């Protein structure tokens, strides 16, 4: 009896030709597709396609809610933007996909897992690092990386094995998508001097085509996570879908970014993240009035490390778990509502409130007669605040010596 292998199946040509290729190696192929909110893809057709090509089983797993609640949530709470721009769209879905692949392999007594990553991308590391962590004995196959066909050779192989070639196969782009956004690379985008053409975008309108009137949305957060829009409570996945559509109409969330990949090269990427742009801007704004001074200044250090761990395939690690416990502790006070203005490609926080956790005191901040700040206390504070530097200068005369030399 042939060994079983679980294939991470997208329905595209690469993972489709992988089915007969793996069969030729003696495997019985089980295709697994995870629905994490891919825009416009007919997930049922993907399941039928895998079976038609030769998979013995094809599973479609609805992971949208789990993805939003257990994965996107961590990015929101930690304000995770890789290199200050990228909200980890593709990197974020990989740990969940891999978890389901390993679980399916165990449930079906499979001896191996196959993925469709190339030898040039980050995903090969993300897939294989997580698989090794979850099951060190699991064998891994990487057909796309191993056979290294040209496009013409791949099409010829597809025809020989009755694998349908997608009608959009001539598209130059390599696209990945989920609830949290859309990534696009390759083709004309590989030259960073080329402006991204209109067809590189799908979720967002060009700014010149956006409405001339702004939309305002009130986003309520509880423990650092969005729970409602304009007083309408929603599951997080539904909330993200809603904001993706609304913010996309206003051209919000376009990112043109040359990033440093884990494997050492620089890559030009086009991202569309409408909901992420709105939610993360609102979340950070709410933190500004609810986090204590030292926490607010220290948290970005932890955020950057968490961001890099996610991007660099270290979701499954004790450090990642420990840092997220710190983040979760900080989010207990991040409760309130932020009013966002969506207009001409920008998402701007224009008002915010927190009934029980706001550290902003209008009486302390005002310059009117309602002021309750004790300004005389500032005199003694200045003396104590500068005392270490004052004593150091008195002893060493550093700056006075510099003046004498001049």
Curated annotation (Swiss-Prot):
<feature type="binding site">
    <location>
        <position position="122"/>
    </location>
    <ligand>
        <name>L-citrulline</name>
    </ligand>
</feature>
<feature type="binding site">
    <location>
        <position position="259"/>
    </location>
    <ligand>
        <name>L-citrulline</name>
    </ligand>
</feature>
<keyword id="KW-0067">ATP-binding</keyword>
<dbReference type="GO" id="GO:0000050">
    <property type="term" value="P:urea cycle"/>
</dbReference>
<dbReference type="GO" id="GO:0004055">
    <property type="term" value="F:argininosuccinate synthase activity"/>
</dbReference>
<dbReference type="InterPro" id="IPR001518">
    <property type="entry name" value="Arginosuc_synth"/>
</dbReference>
<feature type="binding site">
    <location>
        <position position="118"/>
    </location>
    <ligand>
        <name>L-aspartate</name>
    </ligand>
</feature>
<dbReference type="InterPro" id="IPR018223">
    <property type="entry name" value="Arginosuc_synth_CS"/>
</dbReference>
<dbReference type="GO" id="GO:0005737">
    <property type="term" value="C:cytoplasm"/>
</dbReference>
<protein>
    <recommendedName>
        <fullName>Argininosuccinate synthase</fullName>
        <ecNumber>6.3.4.5</ecNumber>
    </recommendedName>
</protein>
<keyword id="KW-0028">Amino-acid biosynthesis</keyword>
<keyword id="KW-0547">Nucleotide-binding</keyword>
<dbReference type="InterPro" id="IPR014729">
    <property type="entry name" value="Rossmann-like_a/b/a_fold"/>
</dbReference>
<keyword id="KW-0963">Cytoplasm</keyword>
<dbReference type="GO" id="GO:0006526">
    <property type="term" value="P:L-arginine biosynthetic process"/>
</dbReference>
<keyword id="KW-0055">Arginine biosynthesis</keyword>
<dbReference type="Pfam" id="PF00764">
    <property type="entry name" value="Arginosuc_synth"/>
</dbReference>
<comment type="subunit">
    <text>Homotetramer.</text>
</comment>
<dbReference type="Pfam" id="PF20979">
    <property type="entry name" value="Arginosuc_syn_C"/>
</dbReference>
<feature type="binding site">
    <location>
        <position position="183"/>
    </location>
    <ligand>
        <name>L-citrulline</name>
    </ligand>
</feature>
<feature type="binding site">
    <location>
        <position position="123"/>
    </location>
    <ligand>
        <name>L-aspartate</name>
    </ligand>
</feature>
<feature type="binding site">
    <location>
        <position position="174"/>
    </location>
    <ligand>
        <name>L-citrulline</name>
    </ligand>
</feature>
<feature type="binding site">
    <location>
        <position position="271"/>
    </location>
    <ligand>
        <name>L-citrulline</name>
    </ligand>
</feature>
<dbReference type="GO" id="GO:0005524">
    <property type="term" value="F:ATP binding"/>
</dbReference>
<feature type="binding site">
    <location>
        <position position="122"/>
    </location>
    <ligand>
        <name>L-aspartate</name>
    </ligand>
</feature>
<dbReference type="InterPro" id="IPR023434">
    <property type="entry name" value="Arginosuc_synth_type_1_subfam"/>
</dbReference>
<feature type="binding site">
    <location>
        <begin position="8"/>
        <end position="16"/>
    </location>
    <ligand>
        <name>ATP</name>
    </ligand>
</feature>
<keyword id="KW-0436">Ligase</keyword>
<dbReference type="InterPro" id="IPR048268">
    <property type="entry name" value="Arginosuc_syn_C"/>
</dbReference>
<dbReference type="InterPro" id="IPR048267">
    <property type="entry name" value="Arginosuc_syn_N"/>
</dbReference>
<dbReference type="InterPro" id="IPR024074">
    <property type="entry name" value="AS_cat/multimer_dom_body"/>
</dbReference>
<comment type="similarity">
    <text>Belongs to the argininosuccinate synthase family. Type 1 subfamily.</text>
</comment>
<dbReference type="GO" id="GO:0000053">
    <property type="term" value="P:argininosuccinate metabolic process"/>
</dbReference>
<comment type="pathway">
    <text>Amino-acid biosynthesis; L-arginine biosynthesis; L-arginine from L-ornithine and carbamoyl phosphate: step 2/3.</text>
</comment>
<feature type="binding site">
    <location>
        <position position="126"/>
    </location>
    <ligand>
        <name>L-citrulline</name>
    </ligand>
</feature>
<feature type="binding site">
    <location>
        <position position="86"/>
    </location>
    <ligand>
        <name>L-citrulline</name>
    </ligand>
</feature>
<feature type="binding site">
    <location>
        <position position="116"/>
    </location>
    <ligand>
        <name>ATP</name>
    </ligand>
</feature>
């Amino acid at each position: 009896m042939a060994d079983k292998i679980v294939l991470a199946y997208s329905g595209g040509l690469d993972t489709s030709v992988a089915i007969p290729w793996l069969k030729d190696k003696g495997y019985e192929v089980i295709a697994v597709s995870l629905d994490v909110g891919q825009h416009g893809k007919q997930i049922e057709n993907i399941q039928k396609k895998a079976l038609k090509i030769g998979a013995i089983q094809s599973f479609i797993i609805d992971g949208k809610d789990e993805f939003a609640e257990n994965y996107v949530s961590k990015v929101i709470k930690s304000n995770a933007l890789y290199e200050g721009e990228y909200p980890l769209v593709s990197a974020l879905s990989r740990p969940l996909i891999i978890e389901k692949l390993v679980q399916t392999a165990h449930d079906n007594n499979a001896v191996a897992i196959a993925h469709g990553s190339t030898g040039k991308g980050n995903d090969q590391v993300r897939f294989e690092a997580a698989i090794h962590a979850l099951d060190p004995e699991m064998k891994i196959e990487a057909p796309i990386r191993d056979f290294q066909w040209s496009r013409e050779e791949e099409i010829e192989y597809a025809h020989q094995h009755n694998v349908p070639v997608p009608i959009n196969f001539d598209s130059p782009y390599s696209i990945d998508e989920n609830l949290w956004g859309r990534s696009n690379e390759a083709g004309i985008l590989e030259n960073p001097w080329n402006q991204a053409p209109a067809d590189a975008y799908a979720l967002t309108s060009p700014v010149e085509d956006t409405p001339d009137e702004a939309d305002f949305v009130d986003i309520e957060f509880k423990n650092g996570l969005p729970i409602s829009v304009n007083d309408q409570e929603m599951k997080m996945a539904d909330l993200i879908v809603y904001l993706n559509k609304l913010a996309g109409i206003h051209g919000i969330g376009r990112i043109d970014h040359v990033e440093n990949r884990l494997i050492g090269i620089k890559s030009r990427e086009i991202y569309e993240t409408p909901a992420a742009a709105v939610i993360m801007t609102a979340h950070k704004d709410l933190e500004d009035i609810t986090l204590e001074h030292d926490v607010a200044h220290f948290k970005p250090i932890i955020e950057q490390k968490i961001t890099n761990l996610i991007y660099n395939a270290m979701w499954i690690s004790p450090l990642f778990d420990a840092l997220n416990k710190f983040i979760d502790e900080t989010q207990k006070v991040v409760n309130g509502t932020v009013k966002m203005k969506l207009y001409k490609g920008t998402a701007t926080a224009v008002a915010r409130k927190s009934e029980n956790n706001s550290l902003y005191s209008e009486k302390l901040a005002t310059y009117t007669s309602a002021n309750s700040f004790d300004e005389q206390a500032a005199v003694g504070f200045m003396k104590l605040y500068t005392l270490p530097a004052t004593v150091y200068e008195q002893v060493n005369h550093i700056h006075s010596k510099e003046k004498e030399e001049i």
